Amino acid sequence: LGLTTLSTKYISLNSKYTGEASILAIIMMIFGVAILTMNQVSLKSRKNYTTVTGKSGQLSKMNLGKVGKYAIAVVMIILTFFTSIFPIFSFALETFLPNPGDYSFLYTKDLSNLTTKWWITKENITENGMYGQHGILYNSTIWHAFAGTLLVAVCCALIAGTIGTLIGYAVAKNRRSRWASYVNGVAFLPYLMPSIAVGAAFFILFSNEKINLFNTYTLLIIAGTIKYIPFASRSALNSMLQISNEIEEAAIIQDIPWTKRMFRIIIPIQKSAIISGYMLPFMTCLRELSLFLLLCTQGFILSTTLDYFDEMGLYAFSSAINLILIVTILIFNTLVNKLTGASLDDGIGGN
């Protein structure tokens, strides 16, 4: 339709018209704060349900009937195929095409048109569209960026998840306090700001003569942690509100210290929700581009490396990076599921 949004307009203005871009960022924040205020007002009279059994959720089953059961199953299968399976297959197939978008082998049925040059080329070849790049398996730029991405994502997840869990616990225990509402609102504030605006703010703050952290993992971790705290704090708060105070009060009567209460009582009861508070920042950080675009050079992490290869026209490399990110997320989610029994497959917080 050729329409623009505030966020896309902000990106187009940010490079040349920083003043106008800052005004747009403030407008977007005002909209976000207004929505958050409306949400808080609407939930003032909400009912709270707590648990004293150690189980924070329940499954409610509904009889869909024979027709409804199969109809919903077919719709879900189709949606899953086009939103999950087909994109992964497309990314994988793109890395074997001789030229971007060349699917001629489908109607010629000649698989010899497919190539593995994008994966296994070891030399700096300038012809065949490689632009002097090694294949994906031997490309040090990609794997160095992958290692850096994992480092940033793990650190952001650990720090943001821990801070968010503590915020959720503190707010839940002092839910009737005005300060608790203030802390909860401030913790959620970074979510209301556009990622590119947060990145620009950290660029101005930490890329100057006195403090220069540009193109360092430290700056990316700081920015990522601040941006992703709302994910962890919201997940932790919702889970902590479900725990009855009587559970912890019984432990306090027994003179059990706070750390032991957390690790032996609170965390085991809400294990799924707390782990979700760590997994959400981790997965978001892996694919983040807007936040880190101004804070590091191309090739420093995978998302900026993907942008670099897109500009070069090496779309097979971009597809491979997308595939690497997807597989990495699936592997980590599976490992967490197997090791802890908690997974995002069952929704935020699990069953």
Over which residues does each language-model region extend?
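Interhelical loop and adjacent transmembrane-helix boundary motif
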Residues: 1-33, 65-69, 95-105, 111-130, ...
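Hydrophobic positions within alpha-helical transmembrane segments of bacterial inner-membrane proteins
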Residues: 33, 37, 157-169, 173, ...
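Membrane-interfacial helix termini and adjacent extracytoplasmic/periplasmic loops
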Residues: 1-4, 56-58, 102-113, 130-135, ...
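Hydrophobic transmembrane alpha-helices
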Residues: 30-31, 81-85, 186-195, 219-230, ...
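Cytoplasmic-entry segments and transmembrane alpha-helices of multi-pass inner-membrane transporters
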Residues: 58, 65-75, 166-202, 350-351
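Transmembrane alpha-helices
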Residues: 74-88, 189, 226, 233-236, ...
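C-terminal transmembrane helix and the adjacent membrane-cytosol boundary/short C-terminal tail
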Residues: 22-64, 170-171, 237-246, 252, ...
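Transmembrane alpha-helix signature in integral membrane proteins
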Residues: 24-42, 135-171, 182
